[in-house]
Amino acid sequence: MAEINKQDFTSKLTKVFKENGLSSHLSLERMEKFFALTVRMLTENEKYNLTAITEVDKIILNHYADCVALSARLKKGASVIDVGCGAGFPSLPLAIVRPDLKIVAVDSTAKRVNYVAETAKMLGLDNLTAITMRAEDGGKSPEYREKFDYATARAVAEMRVLCELTLPFVKVGGQLVAMKGKNAEFELSSAKKAIATLGGRNPVCENITLKGEGETLTHPFIIIDKKEKTPSTFPRPFAQISKKPL
């Protein structure tokens, strides 16, 4: 890994956050944490296969600004579960800029969960807990079922599958906020039955546009209100969810 110039990184981070109205989330301490996160992620990338994005400019835009943009949709002091957290996005950036949030990051891959947990400890993020768990198991567990104000997910599965993996975690009155790709509108239209069946209502797709160094990123966020309890028959085993999505 090529050495990252700290001053250059801080300058780029500050510029991108300012251009996208995110400056209020930065402080000297938080910039230090984003720098430390970047160094650790790129150092550990070969071992854990964390990210295909290794250029600093793209990391700042695609990983940091993108995840921090989610913050505006999360109320103060909320509980958040990041389903399929992977390398810790959005959970790690959110934990850095929102110490008021109580975040649980879950993934079925133990080595990635270990990476997220160790990184959170290194950065002093006491508001983030990482757990190795399959979402369909956690959604049935009394410890986690309907215990969170928000569920987040980034690039995990198509919406019919994702809804069954995430909505069971969300309290009535909470929301699922899914960070999706270019097929978001189509996925949302095909997931109407799944959303209604699982207790979701009022689905909307919002396109978030962010400006970086010579690049513009448009990222759809799908937001679903949880209005009714999820029936006890859901989530089903993953083989059923994937073979026969709702």
Where does each model-flagged region fall?
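Class I SAM-dependent transferase core
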Residues: A2-G77, I81, E118-L128
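Short "lid" loop at the C-terminus of a central beta-strand within the Rossmann-like core
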Residues: E136, G181-E185, L210
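SAM/dcSAM-binding transferase cores
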Residues: S189-L246
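Conserved beta-strand signature within the Rossmann-like core of class I S-adenosyl-L-methionine
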Residues: G173-N183
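Short alpha-helix immediately C-terminal to the canonical SAM-binding loop
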Residues: R112-N114, A184, L188
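Helix-to-beta-strand junctions that scaffold the AdoMet/dcAdoMet cofactor pocket
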Residues: R98, V170-V172
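Conserved SAM/SAH cofactor-binding pocket of Class I
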Residues: A65-C163
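Short loop/edge segments at beta-strand edges and connector loops
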Residues: T54, T132-R134, E206
